Amino acid sequence: MSDSPKPQLPPSPQGDHCLVHQQELEAVTEKWFEIMVRVQPHHTDYGGVVWHGTYLTWLETARVECLRSIGVDFADLVKLGCDLPVVSLALRYHRAIRLGQTAVIKVQMQEIQKVRLEWQNQIVCLETGEPCVTGKITLVAIDPAKGKIMRRLPPVVQEHLLKLRQ
C-alpha cells in the first residue's frame, strides 16, 4: 500500500457545522447549469445531423462540469471511492441539430434522494431557440472497489451538493 495521502474534495464553505453529517440527503433543486457546444463534423452523421450518441456525451460533460462548478471534481470523487454511474436514461428527441449550429446543453440536478441523483436535461438549438432533446438521467453512488451501491454519499459530497439548492 502507498503511504501517499488519499485525495480529498475541498471542504464546503458551510464547514463542519452542516447537519448533513447526521441525516440522509434529500433535496430538490431548481437551478439549471448550461454549457454551449458548436456542432463539429465529428459530432454528426453523414447528413450533417448530430448523431444521437453525441447528445449523451454532451449531457455527461454538462453534469461533470456542473459538479466541478460546486467544488466536486469527478476524478477526485472516484479516487475517494465514489463513482456515479447512470442507472436510468430516458431521452426524447424533438428535432435535429445540424453541423455549424450551437447547442445549449442544460442540466439540473432535480432531486437528490440519499445516493440517487436525478438530473433533468435539455438541449436547445441556440440559433432557433427550439428544444431538440429533453429527458431524465438518474445516477446512483457506488463504491467502485466493491461494485456495490453506497449507503450514503460521503459527507463532504453531500455538503457540496447542497450548493445546487442555493
Curated annotation (Swiss-Prot):
Its EC number is 3.1.-.-. One of its GO terms (molecular function) is fatty acyl-CoA hydrolase activity. The active site is at residue 45. Pfam families: 4HBT_2. It comes from the Bacteria. Keywords: Hydrolase. SUPFAM superfamilies: Thioesterase/thiol ester dehydrase-isomerase. InterPro entries: 4-hydroxybenzoyl-CoA_TE (IPR050563), HB-CoA_thioesterase_AS (IPR008272), HotDog_dom_sf (IPR029069), YbgC/YbaW (IPR006684). Belongs to the 4-hydroxybenzoyl-CoA thioesterase family. This is Putative esterase sll0410.
